[in-house]
């Protein structure tokens, strides 16, 4: 509705910064798929305990110049079935993206999946506790973070990848010779 995270991130156009007057948990009713550019989600503006997104994933798709800061994503497997096994955060074919101070956990497939991005930064974040025995069609899964087919520079620094079975993180599949800075 009016003034919501979804309205600001999906329906508005042009450069914008989303700020929060309240803190709390946003129970998504569907995935938050962001296909707009020039967006900052400033979670640090929320008072008190900050902002948590739960029940559905955050998906950046063909976006550019996006900054997301100080946000928690707790996917979980509520209302999920075997063919619906998302990651907490997916970033597909985006450029100039910064994820900063993100805490993500309880992904059905994994915590984070990035593919085909240019100038991507993940910093000061915690990705942990993917669900191992959940509703994933392959059975036990619990992957952490995957950075696939980067097209250009990628910076992954000062992060914690923990308490998942695999991909702590996995980087690969590039068709070019990008620079990777991993700390």
Features from the language model and the residues they span:
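Extracellular beta-strand-rich solenoid/capping regions of secreted or surface-exposed proteins
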Residues: 2, 6-14, 26-42, 50-70, ...
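Right-handed parallel beta-helix
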Residues: 38, 43, 64-75, 93-106, ...
């Amino acid at each position: 509705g009016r003034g919501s995270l979804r309205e600001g991130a999906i329906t508005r156009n042009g450069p914008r910064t989303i700020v929060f007057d309240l803190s709390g948990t946003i129970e998504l009713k569907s995935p938050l798929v962001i296909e707009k550019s020039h967006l900052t989600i400033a979670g640090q503006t929320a008072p008190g305990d900050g902002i948590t997104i739960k029940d559905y994933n955050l998906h950046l798709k063909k976006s550019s110049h996006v900054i997301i800061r100080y946000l928690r994503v707790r996917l979980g497997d509520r209302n999920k079935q075997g063919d619906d096994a998302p990651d907490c955060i997916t970033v597909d074919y985006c450029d100039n993206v910064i994820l900063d101070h993100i805490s993500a956990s309880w992904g059905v497939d994994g915590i984070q999946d990035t593919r085909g991005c240019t100038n991507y930064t993940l910093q000061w974040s915690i990705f942990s506790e993917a669900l191992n025995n959940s509703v994933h069609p392959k059975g036990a899964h619990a992957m952490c973070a995957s950075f696939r087919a980067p097209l250009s520079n990628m910076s992954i620094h000062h992060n914690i990848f923990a308490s998942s079975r695999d991909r702590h993180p996995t980087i690969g599949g590039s068709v070019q010779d990008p620079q990777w800075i991993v700390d």
